[in-house]
Amino acid sequence: MDTLTAIGRWLAKQHVVTWCVHHEGELWCANAFYLFDAQNVALYLLTDDKTRHAQMSGACAPVAGTVNGQPKTVTRIRGVQFKGVIRRLEGQESDAARKAYLRRFPVARVLPAPVWEIRLDEIKFTDNTLGFGKKLHWLRDSRAQQA
């Protein structure tokens, strides 16, 4: 199994992302339920335009964040650190992402918040189930070189 497939399988089983944005010397983090898109290597989430993190992001911004489980022992630790770009989706792109998101999280139908995409450009996956401190790395540029 290649690195991206292993990371993608794990991300698809999780549902909460923490991401951080930076604007004019200020940092802010947020959490949300997400849907992983393996084809585009992206996370889709809903967040209101009036939130601090959305206003700091504007239409598009660099982002870093994490996805992690809550294991009870060190040997079961698995988690992702990432960097990428967050952007607010519009039009057909937004409609398609919302439809997929609502299939996974039907309760979100009551939320009028816009859909955002976090395009993952670099991922470090720590997976202690493969051995203590085992890390898998993926770069978007490396995928283009392998294709």
Curated annotation (Swiss-Prot):
InterPro entries: Split_barrel_FMN-bd, UPF0306
UniProt superkingdom: Bacteria
Family named by the database record: Belongs to the UPF0306 family.
UniProt cross-references to NCBIfam families, sorted A to Z: PRK03467.1
Family annotation (HAMAP family): UPF0306
Protein name from the UniProt record: UPF0306 protein YhbP
Organism: Salmonella schwarzengrund (strain CVM19633)
Gene: yhbP
